[in-house]
């Protein structure tokens, strides 16, 4: 495979640690380059569940280690992430190159990948990040919107906590509404879910109560067909968790 120079000067053919994305729908969103690098690695660490790894061909499956068991329901998410980071670093100390494979794009709202990037380089390792299909890509297709006309993207909790103004004449994507104001892990769709009343009240500073928005979850082999749940902004706090789990909130322009 021909080496490709990244903006950091790290060749994609000789890294110690690869930070890779599995895309939104695994395994069909894996790029050819990602598959080639996985074949080159001595170990593949991932937060995909063990039952999903059977979708890999046998030669890659044998090198996979699922770290899903380190994510504990109800525990602070930051503690779960730290345990995963430490385990990937421990494995990379003895097996190189190692790959970290995570759903979506590896650096879009992924605390584990961000920590591995900084801590790996602090150790003097060559760390390479490869892009992948993210929910931003798939959701724009789901709602059939061309961002050339403008798009505001923010994480839902951060938007409210930082009191960020919203331009109502520009469509908005708010990521991770399913964990709004929640710092602990929610691993079951049967959970009570977040209280979206503060998010609703914040959005009402910029939109009418009747302005319609959609909770969008893109199709994937693991989660099923795409789901788009339209509601008026004034009603978003009444939705059951199953309607918002794993979704992104799309708000068209007013």
Give names to the regions the model predicted.
Residues 2-20, 43, 93, 126-254:
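Beta-strand/loop-alpha-helix module characteristic of Rossmann-like adenine-cofactor folds
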Residues 2-28, 32-130, 236, 247-248:
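Class I S-adenosyl-L-methionine
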